[in-house]
A protein has these predicted regions:
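A penicillin-recognizing enzyme superfamily signal
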Residues: 2-184
Length: 185
């Protein structure tokens, strides 16, 4: 599911592991990929993709995924997750070329512990994996803002438009908060 956000809105068939090598670099396993497609169907509007990409990047820049900044990249996006009663913890994250999801849970469902959240239990595993997976992959630029998207400074304390203390948030033009009267529509 996250691949469609990572690649700009195109539906592709993901695969889990491309190959496995031993410590000496000998190939142990290689995935037999199906016929390589040269085209893919665009299944999400570019405005949806841009907005979701912005939201998921913010999770890493300022939110529960902030530890991923330790990778030293600005092209990462993701979402932490913790189920009720801390039974499962996960992190789903991506860079344009790689989507990886980590899950922490028990074979027989039961609480992991009060402090075992997606950001504490699953995110560190994702970071360790991505350290290796991203080696040699150049950092991507953010998506270009498509037509029909408006940026507005929103006060993080009130959620209202504010030109002074706001952070940039993106809206469909037809759904953007109005800044002229202070009313939200």
């Amino acid at each position: 599911g996250y691949a469609v956000f990572a690649n700009g809105g195109y539906l592709i068939e993901p695969y889990f592991i491309s190959h496995i090598e031993d410590i000496e670099g000998n190939l142990i396993f290689k995935t037999k990929l199906q016929r390589k497609r040269t085209t893919a169907d665009q299944v999400l509007d570019t405005r949806n993709v841009f907005t979701m990409d912005s939201l998921l990047r913010n999770v890493i820049q300022n939110g529960t995924g902030i530890r991923a900044k330790s990778l030293g990249r600005k092209d990462l996006a993701g979402k932490t997750g913790t189920t009720n009663d801390n039974i499962d913890a996960w992190f789903a994250g991506f860079q344009r070329r790689i989507v990886a999801i980590t899950w922490v849970g028990k074979d027989q469902p039961g609480p992991l512990g009060d402090k075992e959240t997606g950001s504490k239990a699953a995110l560190p595993i994702w970071i360790d994996y991505m350290k290796t997976a991203l080696k040699g992959i150049p950092e991507d630029k953010p998506l270009a803002r498509p037509e029909g998207i408006k940026s507005i400074l929103i006060d993080p304390k009130t959620g209202l438009p504010n030109d002074k203390n706001g952070v940039i948030e993106y809206f469909y033009e037809e759904n953007a908060p109005r800044t002229d009267s202070g009313a939200l529509f």
